[in-house]
């Protein structure tokens, strides 16, 4: 880890920095910010587990930034955003206030909460982005990140909702709610597993079980409550320990990442995969790694949906260029490009009705891949995200009571 951090710190010294600090940028016009950003480099730290997402960023986004703004985008792949949050915190504690390693991070949830608590985010500027007008900030699912108000500290990039994938040729009648899934696991030993938390997707599956054990999300909304957690978590650990002997490899080990789960599904070792981003299912079929008979669905008792964002750290030396990147990502054209089935299939974080007519027409022409459950179908049974303190407690409790 120390070696990797040293490499990242070296990377930061090679980037050209903006000359204006954050407060000076807030007093500029957008034209002045673009001029300040010209010739800059943005080190964007983001999850790197999807070749299609990586290609969209490295080819389409980076290509447009270079051609239109002379900005170099350096995509830095990571597996866990928490490590980068800790890096930024370490820099702050070391007094590195204007020459940080990270210019932009793909983030949400408990990692955003940590950035807020540590005063690690650059805030109060998002209204300067011209394409901020495309965002519906009246939507609480966008204005709040896992229950934490965004308050001008991050910019939405995608909206997602959890879904399950199965091979319809092998599992034509999948379990449609959590109770049925638990029964199915017991009746089909070795055919199900989930990534071990704190893997992002594994943690999400765990929260679905937690919500099921609570009898629904109503008691879990709002700030963390220890008494409620104690009651619901006891039921959750009992359920998970009850099904553990029926999991893949009898629960002796868990996939470390969703990528490993996807490989197990591709190899036919397990009957299900799942993801916050169902578009990944269609891309896996198109790539030939998953069967053509892959189909996906949400649970009738609901699946969790959320928004993910990009954030500029307080000590980024390239804030103007990072703001230009965020504005491009919000544009109707860039949101349309990533929504295309053959590119990514990601759901937009903007109001399509606010975009240009040709962009609206482009969205209307998109045909959802047959392996991807339509977002409108998932939205009929959407569950809210829990606030970040719940996530931390659930993950810690799983490690102590199930994964030990």
Set out the residue ranges of the language-model regions:
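Gram-negative bacterial Sec-dependent N-terminal signal peptides
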Residues: 1-17
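Conserved C-terminal helix/tail region of periplasmic/extracytoplasmic solute-binding proteins
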Residues: 18-30, 263, 369-404
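Early extracytoplasmic/lumenal segment of secretory-pathway proteins
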Residues: 22-110
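Loop/turn elements at helix/coil->beta-strand transitions in domains of secreted/extracellular proteins
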Residues: 39-43, 69-72, 99-103, 188-192, ...
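Extracytoplasmic ligand-binding site segments that recognize negatively charged/polar headgroups
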Residues: 47-60, 75-85, 102-259
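Paired acidic/hydrophobic, glycine-rich loop segments that form the ligand-binding mouth/hinge
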Residues: 96-106, 124, 271-276, 282
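Extracytoplasmic/periplasmic substrate-binding proteins
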Residues: 208, 248-315
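Mature extracytoplasmic/periplasmic domains
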Residues: 303, 308-377
């Amino acid at each position: 880890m120390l070696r990797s951090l040293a490499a990242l710190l070296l990377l930061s010294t090679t980037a050209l920095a903006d000359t204006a600090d954050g407060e000076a940028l807030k007093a500029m016009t957008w034209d002045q910010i673009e001029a300040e950003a010209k010739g800059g480099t943005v080190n964007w730290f983001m999850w790197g587990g999807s070749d299609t997402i990586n290609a969209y960023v490295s080819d389409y986004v980076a290509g447009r930034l270079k051609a239109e703004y002379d900005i170099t985008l350096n995509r830095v792949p990571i597996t866990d955003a928490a490590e980068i949050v800790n890096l930024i915190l370490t820099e702050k504690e070391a007094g590195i206030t204007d020459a940080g390693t990270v210019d932009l991070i793909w983030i949400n949830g408990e990692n955003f909460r940590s950035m807020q608590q540590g005063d690690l985010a650059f805030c109060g500027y998002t209204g300067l982005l011209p394409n901020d007008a495309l965002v519906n900030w009246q939507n609480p699912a966008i204005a709040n990140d896992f229950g934490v108000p965004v308050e001008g500290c991050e910019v939405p990039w995608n909206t997602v909702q959890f879904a399950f994938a199965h091979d319809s040729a092998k599992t034509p009648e999948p379990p449609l709610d959590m109770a049925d899934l638990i029964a199915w696991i017991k009746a089909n030993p070795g055919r199900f597993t989930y990534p071990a938390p704190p893997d992002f997707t594994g943690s999400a599956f765990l929260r679905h079980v937690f919500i099921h054990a609570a009898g629904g999300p109503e008691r879990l909304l709002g700030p963390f409550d220890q008494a409620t957690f104690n009651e619901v978590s006891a039921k959750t650990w009992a359920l998970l320990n009850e099904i553990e002997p029926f999991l893949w490899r009898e629960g002796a080990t868990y996939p470390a990442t969703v990528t490993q789960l996807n490989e197990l599904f591709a190899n036919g070792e397990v009957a299900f995969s799942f993801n916050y981003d169902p578009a990944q299912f269609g891309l896996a079929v198109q790539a030939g790694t998953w069967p053509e008979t892959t189909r996906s669905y949400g649970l009738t008792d609901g699946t969790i949906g959320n928004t993910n964002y990009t954030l500029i750290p307080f000590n980024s030396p390239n804030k103007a260029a990072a703001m230009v990147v965020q504005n491009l990502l919000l544009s109707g054209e860039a949101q349309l490009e990533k929504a295309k089935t053959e590119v990514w299939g990601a759901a937009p974080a903007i109001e399509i009705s606010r975009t240009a007519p040709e962009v609206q027409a482009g969205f209307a022409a998109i045909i959802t891949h047959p392996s991807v459950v339509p977002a409108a179908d998932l939205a009929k049974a959407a569950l809210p995200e829990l606030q970040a303190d719940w996530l931390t407690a659930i993950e810690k409790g799983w490690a102590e009571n199930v994964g030990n």
